[in-house]
């Protein structure tokens, strides 16, 4: 039994979110929650939210036992980027791309 949760358009770059995803891949759900709680990164907060959602989905929809759940797969895909402009010298402007990503997390036993 595999249950997933997805967070789309998270306002963090995919490269930075993958650093946190690598920390929890393959761990038990309880270990992953502890790891994410004490990881001082913005993407850790987002990843914890997705993990808690996946746990709730497994418990409510499938009636799964939380103690046996593991993080089966977690991957981060690049999302659409927000284009912004910042003022530069002599009336010019530079484009700034604010990156987003899609976080997909699957738990199972």
Curated annotation (Swiss-Prot):
Keywords: Ribonucleoprotein, Ribosomal protein, RNA-binding, rRNA-binding
Entry GO MF terms: rRNA binding; structural constituent of ribosome
Keyword Cytoplasm: no
Gene Ontology cellular component annotations, sorted alphabetically: cytosolic large ribosomal subunit
GO process annotations (BP): translation
Highest taxon in the source lineage: Bacteria
Annotated Gene3D superfamilies: Ribosomal protein L22/L17
Coiled coil: none
Summary of the function given for this chain in its UniProt record: This protein binds specifically to 23S rRNA; its binding is stimulated by other ribosomal proteins, e.g. L4, L17, and L20. It is important during the early stages of 50S assembly. It makes multiple contacts with different domains of the 23S rRNA in the assembled 50S subunit and ribosome. The globular domain of the protein is located near the polypeptide exit tunnel on the outside of the subunit, while an extended beta-hairpin is found that lines the wall of the exit tunnel in the center of the 70S ribosome.
Family: Belongs to the universal ribosomal protein uL22 family.
Quaternary assembly: Part of the 50S ribosomal subunit.
Protein's recorded name: Large ribosomal subunit protein uL22
Lineage: Bacteria, Pseudomonadati, Pseudomonadota, Betaproteobacteria, Neisseriales
Gene name per UniProt: rplV
């Amino acid at each position: 039994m595999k249950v997933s949760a997805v967070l789309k358009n998270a306002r963090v770059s995919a490269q930075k979110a993958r650093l946190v995803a690598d920390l929890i891949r393959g761990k038990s759900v309880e270990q992953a929650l502890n790891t994410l709680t004490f990881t001082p990164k913005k993407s850790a907060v987002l990843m914890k939210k997705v993990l808690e959602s996946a746990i709730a989905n497994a418990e409510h929809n499938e009636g799964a036992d939380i103690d046996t759940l593991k993080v089966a797969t977690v991957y981060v895909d690049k999302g659409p980027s927000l284009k912004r402009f910042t003022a530069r010298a002599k009336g010019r402007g530079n484009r700034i791309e604010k990156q987003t990503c899609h976080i997909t997390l699957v738990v199972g036993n």
